[in-house]
Curated annotation (Swiss-Prot):
Gene assigned in the entry: rplI
Molecular function terms, GO-annotated: rRNA binding; structural constituent of ribosome
Role: Binds to the 23S rRNA.
Pfam families according to UniProt: Ribosomal_L9_C, Ribosomal_L9_N
Source superkingdom: Bacteria
Family: Belongs to the bacterial ribosomal protein bL9 family.
SUPFAM superfamilies: L9 N-domain-like (SSF55658), Ribosomal protein L9 C-domain (SSF55653)
Species of provenance: Burkholderia lata (strain ATCC 17760 / DSM 23089 / LMG 22485 / NCIMB 9086 / R18194 / 383)
InterPro entries found in the cross-reference section: Ribosomal_bL9, Ribosomal_bL9/RNase_H1_N, Ribosomal_bL9_bac/chp, Ribosomal_bL9_C, Ribosomal_bL9_C_sf, Ribosomal_bL9_N, Ribosomal_bL9_N_sf
Listed GO CC annotations: ribonucleoprotein complex; ribosome
Lineage: Bacteria, Pseudomonadati, Pseudomonadota, Betaproteobacteria, Burkholderiales
Keywords (A to Z) from UniProt: Ribonucleoprotein, Ribosomal protein, RNA-binding, rRNA-binding
Name of the protein described by the UniProt record: Large ribosomal subunit protein bL9
Coiled-coil segments: none
Gene Ontology biological process: translation
Length: 150
Protein backbone atom coordinates (compact mmCIF):
# COMPACT_ATOMS: atom_id res chain seq x y z
CA UNK A 1 0.00 0.00 0.00
CA UNK A 2 1.29 3.47 -0.87
CA UNK A 3 1.12 5.90 2.04
CA UNK A 4 2.23 9.45 2.75
CA UNK A 5 3.95 9.97 6.10
CA UNK A 6 2.53 12.71 8.33
CA UNK A 7 5.52 12.58 10.70
CA UNK A 8 8.94 10.99 10.91
CA UNK A 9 8.73 7.22 11.42
CA UNK A 10 11.84 5.27 12.44
CA UNK A 11 13.19 2.93 9.75
CA UNK A 12 10.58 4.16 7.26
CA UNK A 13 10.99 7.82 6.32
CA UNK A 14 10.45 11.48 7.08
CA UNK A 15 7.48 13.82 6.96
CA UNK A 16 6.00 13.92 3.47
CA UNK A 17 7.71 10.82 2.11
CA UNK A 18 5.56 8.54 -0.01
CA UNK A 19 6.49 4.96 0.82
CA UNK A 20 5.17 1.48 0.13
CA UNK A 21 4.40 -0.65 3.19
CA UNK A 22 2.50 -3.84 3.88
CA UNK A 23 -1.26 -3.36 4.07
CA UNK A 24 -1.55 -4.60 7.66
CA UNK A 25 1.17 -2.25 8.93
CA UNK A 26 -0.60 0.70 7.33
CA UNK A 27 -4.14 -0.26 8.38
CA UNK A 28 -3.38 -1.47 11.89
CA UNK A 29 -0.64 0.91 13.03
CA UNK A 30 0.32 3.87 10.85
CA UNK A 31 -3.13 5.14 9.84
CA UNK A 32 -4.91 4.66 13.23
CA UNK A 33 -2.03 6.40 15.04
CA UNK A 34 -2.22 9.32 12.57
CA UNK A 35 1.34 8.75 11.39
CA UNK A 36 0.31 8.27 7.75
CA UNK A 37 -2.49 8.51 5.18
CA UNK A 38 -3.18 6.57 2.01
CA UNK A 39 -1.34 8.20 -0.87
CA UNK A 40 -4.32 9.16 -3.05
CA UNK A 41 -4.17 12.22 -5.31
CA UNK A 42 -6.54 14.07 -2.98
CA UNK A 43 -4.52 13.18 0.13
CA UNK A 44 -1.26 14.28 -1.52
CA UNK A 45 -2.80 17.60 -2.59
CA UNK A 46 -4.22 18.16 0.91
CA UNK A 47 -0.86 17.28 2.46
CA UNK A 48 0.97 19.81 0.27
CA UNK A 49 -1.44 22.50 1.52
CA UNK A 50 -0.83 21.52 5.18
CA UNK A 51 2.89 20.74 4.78
CA UNK A 52 4.19 23.94 6.43
CA UNK A 53 1.83 23.48 9.39
CA UNK A 54 2.88 19.85 9.89
CA UNK A 55 6.58 20.73 9.60
CA UNK A 56 6.11 23.46 12.23
CA UNK A 57 4.39 20.99 14.59
CA UNK A 58 7.16 18.43 14.02
CA UNK A 59 9.84 21.06 14.74
CA UNK A 60 8.06 22.07 17.97
CA UNK A 61 7.88 18.44 19.12
CA UNK A 62 11.58 17.99 18.36
CA UNK A 63 12.52 21.17 20.25
CA UNK A 64 10.43 20.13 23.27
CA UNK A 65 12.01 16.66 23.24
CA UNK A 66 15.51 18.14 23.01
CA UNK A 67 14.81 20.43 25.98
CA UNK A 68 13.61 17.50 28.10
CA UNK A 69 16.53 15.41 26.83
CA UNK A 70 19.07 17.99 28.01
CA UNK A 71 17.59 17.89 31.53
CA UNK A 72 17.31 14.09 31.59
CA UNK A 73 20.58 13.07 29.90
CA UNK A 74 23.09 11.47 32.26
CA UNK A 75 20.88 11.66 35.35
CA UNK A 76 20.82 8.87 37.89
CA UNK A 77 17.72 7.51 39.61
CA UNK A 78 17.33 5.06 42.48
CA UNK A 79 14.74 2.35 42.85
CA UNK A 80 14.41 -0.10 45.75
CA UNK A 81 13.31 -3.70 45.21
CA UNK A 82 13.26 -6.76 47.44
CA UNK A 83 16.31 -8.92 46.86
CA UNK A 84 18.12 -11.96 48.11
CA UNK A 85 21.51 -11.93 49.80
CA UNK A 86 23.23 -12.85 46.52
CA UNK A 87 22.08 -9.61 44.83
CA UNK A 88 19.33 -11.09 42.69
CA UNK A 89 15.97 -9.36 42.79
CA UNK A 90 12.70 -11.06 43.64
CA UNK A 91 11.01 -10.08 40.39
CA UNK A 92 12.56 -7.45 38.15
CA UNK A 93 12.61 -3.76 37.26
CA UNK A 94 10.81 -3.30 33.93
CA UNK A 95 10.45 -0.37 31.55
CA UNK A 96 7.07 0.36 33.17
CA UNK A 97 8.76 0.72 36.57
CA UNK A 98 11.37 3.08 35.09
CA UNK A 99 8.68 5.17 33.34
CA UNK A 100 6.75 5.45 36.62
CA UNK A 101 9.94 6.50 38.43
CA UNK A 102 10.60 9.19 35.79
CA UNK A 103 7.00 10.46 36.05
CA UNK A 104 7.42 10.86 39.81
CA UNK A 105 10.60 12.85 39.09
CA UNK A 106 8.61 15.19 36.81
CA UNK A 107 9.40 13.81 33.35
CA UNK A 108 6.54 12.83 31.02
CA UNK A 109 7.75 9.47 29.69
CA UNK A 110 5.69 6.53 28.46
CA UNK A 111 6.86 2.97 29.10
CA UNK A 112 7.30 2.37 25.36
CA UNK A 113 9.91 5.14 25.30
CA UNK A 114 12.11 3.34 27.85
CA UNK A 115 14.56 0.97 26.18
CA UNK A 116 16.39 -1.64 28.18
CA UNK A 117 19.03 -3.29 25.96
CA UNK A 118 19.61 -6.23 28.32
CA UNK A 119 15.94 -6.68 29.18
CA UNK A 120 14.40 -6.20 32.63
CA UNK A 121 16.87 -5.51 35.45
CA UNK A 122 17.25 -8.55 37.71
CA UNK A 123 20.34 -7.66 39.76
CA UNK A 124 21.11 -4.89 42.22
CA UNK A 125 23.59 -2.23 41.12
CA UNK A 126 23.83 0.47 38.46
CA UNK A 127 22.33 -0.15 35.04
CA UNK A 128 22.31 2.00 31.89
CA UNK A 129 18.89 2.58 30.31
CA UNK A 130 17.94 4.54 27.19
CA UNK A 131 14.93 6.84 26.91
CA UNK A 132 13.70 7.65 23.38
CA UNK A 133 11.93 10.99 23.76
CA UNK A 134 11.68 11.41 19.96
CA UNK A 135 12.95 9.44 16.98
CA UNK A 136 15.95 11.81 16.91
CA UNK A 137 16.37 12.30 20.69
CA UNK A 138 17.60 9.28 22.67
CA UNK A 139 19.21 9.90 26.07
CA UNK A 140 21.03 7.62 28.50
CA UNK A 141 20.14 7.51 32.18
CA UNK A 142 21.44 5.38 35.04
CA UNK A 143 19.12 3.33 37.22
CA UNK A 144 20.62 2.33 40.56
CA UNK A 145 18.74 -0.70 41.87
CA UNK A 146 19.02 -0.95 45.65
CA UNK A 147 18.31 -4.28 47.30
CA UNK A 148 15.96 -4.52 50.26
CA UNK A 149 16.98 -7.62 52.25
CA UNK A 150 13.91 -7.55 54.50
Amino acid sequence: MQIILLEKVANLGNLGDIVKVKDGYARNFLIPNRKARRATKEAIAEFEVRRAELEKIAAEKLAASQAVGEKLNGQSFEITQKSGVDGRLFGSVTNGDVAELLKKAGFEVEKLQVRMPEGPLKMIGEHSVQVALHTDVVVDITINVIGDHA
